[in-house]
A protein has these predicted regions:
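N-terminal acidic leader/helix
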Residues: 1-31
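Short, charge-rich amphipathic interface segments used for partner binding and complex assembly
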Residues: 28-66
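Short acidic DE-rich linear segments
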Residues: 67-71
Length: 71
């Protein structure tokens, strides 16, 4: 059962990771949002895992970018 508001907000927060100046705490915050949405039944486990994978990908991309530009 997909909740359009919850999924839209998760999509937005994951997209914002691309501009994050502090990707580690931002990743933790969004991961908490995903966990809560799954716990209260706004998204199912498959959707939550998909969001986690997308978040990890964006986090790694942003973290690598920040490491490159600061070197």
């Amino acid at each position: 059962v997909k909740n359009p508001l919850a999924t839209s907000r998760l999509d937005l927060e994951i997209a914002k990771m691309a501009r994050s100046c502090t990707p580690i705490p931002d990743r933790t915050f969004v991961m908490g949002m995903i966990e809560l949405a799954e716990f209260v039944g706004l998204i199912n486990r498959h959707e939550a895992n998909d969001y986690r994978d997308r978040l990890d990908l964006k986090f790694c991309e942003r973290n690598d970018h920040l490491k490159r530009v600061s070197a």
